[in-house]
Amino acid sequence: MALLEVKDLRVESKDGTEIVRGASLTVDEGEIVDLIGPNGSGKSTLAKTIVGCSGYEVVEGEVRFKGRDITDLPMYERARMGLTMSWQEPARFEGLTVGEYLSVCTDDEDWARRCLRIVGLDPEEYWDRECGENLSGGERKRVELAAVMAMRPNLVILDEPDAGLDMSSMEDLAKVIETMREEGSAVLLITHNRDLAEQVGDRAYLMMDGKIVDEGDPRDVVLKCLMCGGGLVCGAE
């Protein structure tokens, strides 16, 4: 049984615009699955629907997690079940220090500090620093990744985790994703970075115009995406 199963999902925005048009995918326990495709193909909307964000309406299909139909569950109940997401634009968490933010995610301070090290931040330097304007966009992204890792969710959706990071950080990011797997998390990775997708993904889905149009080995799916003008970038660029 798949950990996550999305069946024939159709999703509309509040104004009735159809964004996801019959998408289906699965993620198994401990698996890293890429979701790639051009901008505007519906990837982020599909991800937000999976975790239960408001602003979208499921008009057909279902989302199942751990064998349970969660299509109509609110986001906080999905989070309690072990389903979470790292956003493309991380929150600022004004007024909290990095340590306070991570303490919301785990009671194990040693593990939280280790998570900071894994994402490339020295806990001695960052633990007592305030979030928000005191951190650069790249630093906020790293803190967000550390927080998600600290929670040890069953499934984490990473929406463009390389956004705001320089290309020299890609190897570190791959290690972060692999560490998430080692700690028991399956990963659904949304990315435009072909090197990252090929390096960490076990399988890949290609989404275009609101539909899943291909599934298979990441290298094969990346190639098809490039042939279709999917807008992927090379990590070395």
Where are these regions (language model features)?
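Walker B catalytic motif
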Residues: 160-161
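ABC ATPase NBD coupling module
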Residues: 69-84
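A short, surface-exposed alpha-helical micro-motif characterized by mixed small hydrophobic
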Residues: 197-199
